[in-house]
Amino acid sequence: MKLIVGLGNPGFEYEHTRHNIGFKIIDKLLDVLNLELNKSQFNGLYVKHDDFIIAKPLTYMNLSGNFIRQLVNFYKIQIDDILVIHDELAFNLGVVRLKQNGSANGQKGVANIISQLGTQNFKRLRVGIKNEDLKNIASFVLSKFAPNELILLESAIASASVIAYDFLKSNKSFSKLMNEYNQ
């Protein structure tokens, strides 16, 4: 059973912020698969299909790990079958990269997941949100995208949803996916 979780913050006020790009990608993936989040459990929303689960935590980003840990335990999901989609401040807007494992790189939602799962050996799909205005990081990640950024944003969401779909539906190894998409 594979698990894809998009990170973001719940609530209308955060809907179009940089921090919620993980939610946006989940929405696009659900559209492609003609699915909707239909289960509410463990303080999150998800849909369980035959061999995968797609989910969004309903906690604030920095507390996402508890929801993921509960899904993993309940459905007996292997750590190697988890893909977490999140914003990446280290990448320019529009850059999309897969990562096998490793540190949180300052991303507090990922840090909480590492803490809750007791491992950093889960897969990530990191989506760049950086622009040149990084005076206050906390304010920046909770800011909305500027009109001139929307084309790059839509392109990143489309690319990331294709990668997430490939993770779910193909039999390619993660190394092969990284070689194919991390260019």
From Swiss-Prot:
Entry GO CC: cytoplasm
Annotated active site: 19
Main localization of the protein described in the UniProt heading: cytoplasm
Matches recorded under InterPro entries: Pept_tRNA_hydro, Pept_tRNA_hydro_CS, Pept_tRNA_hydro_sf
Keywords (A to Z) from UniProt: Cytoplasm, Hydrolase, RNA-binding, tRNA-binding
Family to which this protein belongs: Belongs to the PTH family.
HAMAP family, alphabetized: Pept_tRNA_hydro_bact
PANTHER family, A to Z: PEPTIDYL-TRNA HYDROLASE (PTHR17224:SF1)
Name of protein: Peptidyl-tRNA hydrolase
Organism from which the protein derives: Mycoplasmoides gallisepticum (strain R(low / passage 15 / clone 2)) (Mycoplasma gallisepticum)
